[in-house]
C-alpha cells in the first residue's frame, strides 16, 4: 500500500490544504494528514480541534486518515511505515524553507523522500495566518476555508 504523510499545523486548514489532500488521495492508496501538536507556535485551535477541523473538511475521502503527532516528523513517519512526506509549495518564497527542511529530513532519514505539490492556482495565495487575521478582524473567509472551518473561526473570533 502506497502511503504518504502530509504534515502541518493546519491552524486552520484552508481550501489550499484540502486541494492538496484530495489530489494526494488520487495519487496514493492512503494519505495520513499529520496534525502537529508541538509547533513552536501558539495556535488558535487546540490539537484536538485542529484534528476535528481537518476531519470535517476532508470527509468523504475514504483513504484519508487524520492523526495528531508530536516530535520529529521523520520519527512519526517511521512509526507508520511511511516513506514519503508530502509538502505544499504555494510560491517561490516557500521553496527555500521547504528545501532546507527536506534536506534535514533526508539527513535524519535517508529512506524517507519528500514530495512537493503545488496547489491549484486559485489557492496559491491562501495561508492559514492570513485566514486567521481576516477572521480576527471579522472579515469574510468563506472563499478560503470550508464551512466547518468558517463556523469554528466565527465561534472563536465572533
Curated annotation (Swiss-Prot):
SUPFAM superfamilies referenced in this protein's UniProt entry, alphabetically: Nucleotidylyl transferase
Single Gene Ontology MF annotation: pantetheine-phosphate adenylyltransferase activity
Keyword Nucleotide-binding: yes
Gene3D superfamilies: HUPs
Keywords assigned: ATP-binding, Coenzyme A biosynthesis, Cytoplasm, Magnesium, Nucleotide-binding, Nucleotidyltransferase, Transferase
Residues with site note (Transition state stabilizer): 17
Pathways per UniProt: Cofactor biosynthesis; coenzyme A biosynthesis; CoA from (R)-pantothenate: step 4/5
Enzyme class: transferase
Cell compartment(s), UniProt: Cytoplasm
Binding site for ATP: 9-10, 17, 88-90, 98, 123-129
Cofactor annotation: Mg(2+)
BP terms from Gene Ontology: coenzyme A biosynthetic process
Record's function text: Reversibly transfers an adenylyl group from ATP to 4'-phosphopantetheine, yielding dephospho-CoA (dPCoA) and pyrophosphate.
PANTHER family from the UniProt entry: PHOSPHOPANTETHEINE ADENYLYLTRANSFERASE
Family: Belongs to the bacterial CoaD family.
Name assigned to this protein: Phosphopantetheine adenylyltransferase
Organism: Allochromatium vinosum (strain ATCC 17899 / DSM 180 / NBRC 103801 / NCIMB 10441 / D)
